[in-house]
Amino acid sequence: MESKCLMFVSIVSVFFMVVNGVSETETLLKFKNSLVIGRANALESWNRRNPPCKWTGVLCDRGFVWGLRLENLELSGSIDIEALMGLNSLRSLSFINNKFKGPFPEFKKLVALKSLYLSNNQFDLEIPKDAFDGMGWLKKLHLEQNNFIGEIPTSLVKSPKLIELRLDGNRFTGQIPEFRHHPNMLNLSNNALAGQIPNSFSTMDPKLFEGNKGLCGKPLDTKCSSPYNHSSEPKSSTKKTSSKFLYIVAAAVAALAASLIIIGVVIFLIRRRKKKQPLLSAEPGPSSLQMRAGIQESERGQGSYHSQNRAAKKMIHTTKLSFLRDDKGKFELQDLLKASAEILGSGCFGASYKTLLSNGSVMVVKRFKHMNSAGIDEFQEHMKRLGRLNHENLLPIVAYYYKKEEKLFVSDFVANGSLAAHLHGHKSLGQPSLDWPTRFNIVKGVGRGLLYLHKNLPSLMAPHGHLKSSNVLLSEKFEPLLMDYGLIPMINEESAQELMVAYKSPEYVKQSRVTKKTDVWGLGVLILEILTGKLLESFSQVDKESEEDLASWVRSSFKGEWTQELFDQEMGKTSNCEAHILNLMRIGLSCCEVDVEKRLDIREAVEKMEDLMKEREQGDDDFYSTYASEADGRSSRGLSSEGINLS
């Protein structure tokens, strides 16, 4: 009986898979019929002989279509939303660099869509105000380099999960609205927007708002004129004017009196407070790290003077920084708290702050909130282990501060920013990306740093555990510096499983285990990201599997030869380096093997990269043509005169 039930379940499962496959096939073919395909044979694979998951530009997960990536195909015609509604798992659409125009399609009918990319098309009409109503899952919207007109849609302003918004290079008019949720990436440059920039955007890069002649206010240098035009106010009689004047004077006197009373009370309370308890804090200004991070140095309850004094002495002991490096000048936590601070970003574990000390040193303070799994003794012992690490491709931890509720890590400030910013952020600002020799040097350095961690932290299954492009900083000479390594023993298990890269690996997703090769998988994904220039999130239907999705996409697209659709054209290639780029892609895919037994170990991966480097040094004079010795020569600067144009 049990075997019959199992057989029935299997038959039903197969039946539904077949029905779904046919349904998605017919749905996509119907969608294809609405397109005008400019590039010959661009969608030739879209036929009934092959399953949809093998079609060009179709992204699948577990046999279901979750994304369409139809870029650079000279497509026009209409985007058949009704057909796309038949794809129940659809989460991502990309039609970048095509020739679509006309009315804005009704994407709001695709309520589960997470990302939409329409950059570099020919849309030239107004977007309806309700164009994004009901799209509560929308995270990323790229509409740059079109000719959209009219105001920014009000429905877009209400999007609860929007983290990326690019509207640059259009003809949007009107004022910038107040967004309900502040996007992490926003570019409104080169439009016809006017009015004052909302205060919530006042600390952003001015370049994100340039090219709008009517905009004023921070972060631009253009000051806004008074919002009131008194000359246009209607004239009133002398009697009414005098009456209004008397009311204004009376109100001003009353307000002044109330202010004086409040100030007096505040001064009284401050003096009373100073007499009753010791003041440990350095009284930082409003832009200090203490004010920005909300760090408190002491608990100021209503106990007696003696109990507060004992607490104060205890806090003096516990607020000392523990230094891991002797080559840095010593400073106290109070020096950090009273220093001017600038928030650099907020990652999955907490915020990072850039601080300028009185001695001129620039440090970064990273605040961790998910480190309650280790007691103070265990925590300090592990920090000493990390402090003993010394490698040119690791960012050292200078000092740390321990408190049960949160921890602070102090490190040197690296002005050149992260690899993620150079790969993805610079594009949004129209700046050149990293060239090929620089990218290869970064990959090689990351591999060496990772190998060092595996040699010196042998007790950890994943010595890094959180390798991704935003955790790779670049020095002035574009040497990679790994950060956020060795954190797994200190991060709460639940938070680690939710947030850390190691727990997104195939072996953990499928078997709930982390292995010695898990970091190698992270290295492989990083190599693919560097070579393709693709954002991992662009491939994510289920966020925790985004890296595996990128590897699957590359594996299905890579045919052993150079293709413009697969490789990032921003890095360029010289006449003799194509084979080396392809070999590095093969190394990356070998690191991304889903089967752990078939995956390279870290030593094998690094050896293959070193062998590739030797080949370059022996036979590729072209390799160094864009690889100057000066720091500015190895920056994001495109091709040399010998480069091949990939456009």
Swiss-Prot record:
It catalyses: L-seryl-[protein] + ATP = O-phospho-L-seryl-[protein] + ADP + H(+); L-threonyl-[protein] + ATP = O-phospho-L-threonyl-[protein] + ADP + H(+). It is found in: Cell membrane. Residues 620-647 are annotated as: Disordered. Disruption phenotype: No effect on pollen germination and growth. Prk1 and prk2 or prk2 and prk5 double mutants have no effect on pollen germination and growth. Prk1, prk2 and prk5 triple mutant shows reduced pollen tube elongation. LRR repeats lie at residues 87-109, 110-134, 136-159, 161-183, 185-203. The chain crosses the membrane at residues 248-268. ATP binds at residues 344-352, 366. Residues 338-613 form the Protein kinase domain. Expressed in pollen and/or in flowers, but not in leaves. Expressed in pollen tube. GO terms for biological process: pollen germination; pollen tube growth; regulation of pollen tube growth. Pfam families: LRR_1, LRRNT_2, Pkinase. PROSITE patterns: PROTEIN_KINASE_DOM. SUPFAM superfamilies: L domain-like (SSF52058), Protein kinase-like (PK-like) (SSF56112). It is a single-pass membrane protein. Residues 1-21 form the signal peptide. One of its GO terms (cellular component) is plasma membrane. The phosphorylation activity is calcium-independent. Residues 637-647 have a biased composition (Polar residues). Keywords: ATP-binding, Cell membrane, Kinase, Leucine-rich repeat, Membrane, Nucleotide-binding, Phosphoprotein, Receptor, Repeat, Signal, Transferase, Transmembrane, Transmembrane helix. It comes from the Eukaryota. Part of a complex containing ROPGEF1 and ARAC11/ROP1. The interaction between PRK2, ROPGEF1 and ARAC11/ROP1 is phosphorylation-independent. Interacts with ROPGEF12 (via C-terminus). Interacts with ROPGEF1 (via PRONE domain). The protein kinase domain may be catalytically impaired due to the lack of the conserved Asp active site at position 466, which is replaced by a His residue. Receptor-like kinase involved in the control of pollen germination and pollen tube polar growth. Phosphorylates ROPGEF1 in its C-terminal region, releasing its auto-inhibition, and thereby activating the ROP1 signaling pathway. May act as a scaffolding protein, recruiting ROPGEF12 to the plasma membrane by binding to its C-terminal domain. Phosphorylates ROPGEF12, releasing its auto-inhibition. This is Pollen receptor-like kinase 2. The lineage of its organism: Eukaryota, Viridiplantae, Streptophyta, Embryophyta, Tracheophyta.
